[in-house]
UniProtKB/Swiss-Prot annotation:
HAMAP family: Cys_tRNA_synth
MF-aspect GO terms: ATP binding; cysteine-tRNA ligase activity; zinc ion binding
Names of the cofactor(s): Zn(2+)
Gene designation: cysS
Main location: cytoplasm
Assembly behavior: Monomer.
Cofactor note: Binds 1 zinc ion per subunit.
Keywords: Aminoacyl-tRNA synthetase, ATP-binding, Cytoplasm, Ligase, Metal-binding, Nucleotide-binding, Protein biosynthesis, Zinc
Residue numbers covered by motif 'HIGH' region: 31-41
One Pfam entry name: tRNA-synt_1e
PANTHER family, sorted: CYSTEINE--TRNA LIGASE, CYTOPLASMIC (PTHR10890:SF3), CYSTEINYL-TRNA SYNTHETASE (PTHR10890)
EC number: 6.1.1.16
Taxonomic classification: Bacteria, Bacillati, Bacillota, Bacilli, Bacillales
Protein name per the record: Cysteine--tRNA ligase
Biological process annotations from GO: cysteinyl-tRNA aminoacylation
C-alpha cells in the first residue's frame, strides 16, 4: 500500500507521488514570534513532525522547511510594550520556541528561515508580480490583483462572487478592488522598514511564505501544510502569488490539521481559555503532551482537559512499562533463556503487527490507529513475558519493534521522571530486602516492598531468586 494523503485541494485522499523519487519537499507555516506559542500551535508542529518522521522511515529524504515571521504588526506592538527592538523580541521568542518544541521531541527542520533574513527574495517576488501585471503600487503599498488570478478560491472552495461582499474583506481606499490583498506595506513613522523599489516598508504576511518556499524548495513543492485556519486567506493567497509569478503548480498536496479545543470550546483570548505551550509544559510531561496530540487523527478536532491528559498519561505509561519490562528481562536474564517451541509463531505475530502499524500510517498518517496497534504490541509483550520459557530472539524483536514505533511517533519509552528508580537502584533495594529477610527483619523487608510498590515496581519471588517488573 502506498502512502495516502487527504489533499485539501482535491478534497479526497490521493496516493502520494513525489516530484522526485525518494525525496519529499515539505513546507509548514511557522509561528509569528511575538510571544510564546499557544498550545493549539503545538498540534501542527507535532503532527507534521510525525508525518516527516514517517516519510523518513519509509526511506524518503525529507527537506523540511518551516519559517519564522519575525516582523509584523504584532511584533512591533510587542516591542513597544516590552521596550525592546523588533529583532530583540523575535530573538527572545525564537529561543523560547526551540526550548519548548525540543521538549516535545520535535526534530530540527532542514532550515527555519526568518523573514528578515530573506528580504531580497521577497522584494524580487513582488517585483515579478508587478512586471506580470498581477500586482500594483498604491501610495507606497503594493497589492495583488486577486481577480486577475482565475483559479483564486480553488483551495478553500470559495467563488470570487461569494467573496465580493464577504465579512473577511477589509475596505481600503488604496486598493483598486476590495478583494486585493497586501504584498508590501508602506512604512509608518518610527516603524522598522526595508528599502525597496516601491519605497520603504515591510512585506505582507502571505508573500513571505511564497518567497521562502520558492527559495529553499523550488517553484513546485510536494507538500504544504498548516492548521485549518490557514486555508483561507493565507494559503489561498500563497497559491495565487506563487502560481501567478512562476506559471507552475505551487504545491501538489495540501495538508491541514483541525483545531484544538479547551473543554470543548475553541481556544481564544476572548473566552479566557488561551493557554501557551510554555505554561502547559510547566505542569505536564512533554512526552504525554505529544502522545495526547497523536491520539486523535489530525483532521479531527481534539479537546484538551485534565481528564483527557490523565488518560493520555495512563496510555503512555502502559507502553513504557511494557518496554521497560522487556528491556529489563533481556538485560538481567540472559543466561536463562531456552529455545522456545513457538518462537516462529510469535515472530510472525510481530511481523503482522508491524504491517498493521504501517497500514495505519499509510492511511493519511492515522496516528490514532497506529497507537492502538502499539498498545496491541505492548499487550502481547506482556503476555509473552508471563510465559515460563521465553526466547531471546522474540524478546529482542519485541524491543526492536517498540523502539521502531516510538521513533516514528516521536515518543520516548525510557522513564524520564526524576522520582523514578533505575534498574541498579531497584536491584540494590532488592538486595537490601533479601538481607533484611535473612536477618529476620521482616518489618524492613515489607517496608522496602512498599517503597518499590509506590514506584510501580512489582516483586516476584521465584525459586531462582527475586525478579521485578514495572507495572
Amino acid at each position: 500500500m502506498s502512502i495516502q494523503i487527504f489533499n485539501t485541494l482535491k478534497r479526497e485522499k490521493e496516493p502520494f507521488k513525489p516530484l522526485k523519487d525518494g525525496e519529499v519537499k515539505m513546507y509548514v507555516c511557522g509561528p509569528t514570534v511575538y510571544n510564546y506559542i499557544h498550545i493549539g500551535n503545538a498540534r501542527p508542529i507535532i503532527v507534521f513532525d510525525t508525518v516527516r518522521r514517517y516519510f523518513t522511515y519509509r526511506g524518503y529524504d525529507v527537506k523540511f522547511v518551516s519559517n519564522f515571521t519575525d516582523v509584523d504588526d504584532k511584533l512591533i506592538r510587542a516591542a513597544n510594550e516590552l521596550k525592546l527592538t523588533v529583532p530583540e523580541v523575535a530573538d527572545r521568542f525564537i529561543g523560547a520556541y526551540f526550548d519548548d518544541v525540543d521538549q516535545l521531541n520535535v526534530a530540527k527542520a532542514t532550515v527555519n528561515p526568518r523573514v528578515t533574513e530573506n528580504m531580497d527574495e521577497i522584494i524580487q517576488l513582488i517585483s515579478t508580480l508587478i512586471e506580470k501585471g498581477y500586482a500594483y503600487e498604491s501610495a507606497g503599498d503594493v497589492y495583488f490583483r486577486t481577480k486577475k488570478f482565475k483559479d483564486y478560491g480553488k483551495l478553500s472552495g470559495q467563488e470570487l462572487s461569494e467573496l465580493q461582499h464577504g465579512a473577511r474583506v477589509e475596505y481600503n481606499e488604496r486598493k483598486q478592488d476590495e478583494l486585493d490583498f497586501t504584498l508590501w506595506k508602506a512604512a509608518k513613522p518610527g516603524e522598522i522598514f526595508w528599502e525597496s523599489p516601491f519605497g520603504n516598508g515591510r512585506p505582507g504576511w502571505h508573500i513571505e511564505c511564497s518567497a521562502l518556499a520558492k527559495k529553499y524548495l523550488g517553484d513546485t513543492i510536494d507538500i504544504h501544510a498548516g492548521g485549518q485556519d490557514l486555508v483561507f486567506p493565507h494559503h489561498e493567497d500563497e497559491i495565487a502569488q506563487s502560481e501567478a509569478a512562476t506559471g507552475k503548480t505551487f504545491a501538489n498536496y495540501w495538508m491541514h490539521n483541525a483545531f484544538l479545543n479547551i473543554d470543548g470550546e475553541k481556544m481564544s483570548k476572548s473566552l479566557g481559555n488561551f493557554i501557551t505551550l510554555h505554561d502547559v509544559l510547566k505542569d505536564n510531561d512533554p512526552n504525554v503532551i505529544r502522545f495526547f496530540m497523536l491520539s486523535v487523527h489530525y483532521r479531527k478536532p481534539i479537546t484538551l482537559n485534565d481528564a483527557i491528559l490523565e488518560d493520555a498519561k495512563n496510555g503512555l505509561e502502559r507502553l513504557m512499562i511494557a518496554y521497560q519490562n522487556i528491556d529489563h528481562r533481556i538485560q538481567t536474564d540472559d543466561g536463562e533463556y531456552v529455545e522456545e517451541a513457538h518462537e516462529d509463531e510469535w515472530l510472525e505475530q510481530l511481523t503482522e503487527l508491524k504491517q498493521a502499524f504501517e497500514d495505519d500510517m499509510d492511511d493519511d498518517f492515522n496516528t490514532a490507529n497506529a497507537i492502538t496497534t502499539f498498545h496491541e504490541l505492548a499487550k502481547r509483550a506482556n503476555i509473552y513475558l508471563a510465559k515460563e520459557t521465553v526466547s531471546i530472539n522474540v524478546l529482542r524483536e519485541f524491543l526492536s519493534m517498540m523502539r521502531l514505533f516510538a521513533e516514528v511517533l516521536g515518543l520516548k519509552l525510557e522513564n524520564t521522571q526524576t522520582d523514578s528508580l533505575d534498574d541498579s537502584e531497584v536491584e540494590a533495594l532488592i538486595e537490601e530486602r533479601l538481607q533484611a529477610r535473612n536477618e529476620r527483619n521482616f518489618a524492613r523487608a515489607d517496608e522496602i516492598r512498599d517503597i518499590l510498590k509506590e514506584k510501580n515496581i512489582i516483586l516476584e519471588d521465584t525459586a531462582q531468586g527475586t525478579r521485578f517488573r514495572r507495572g
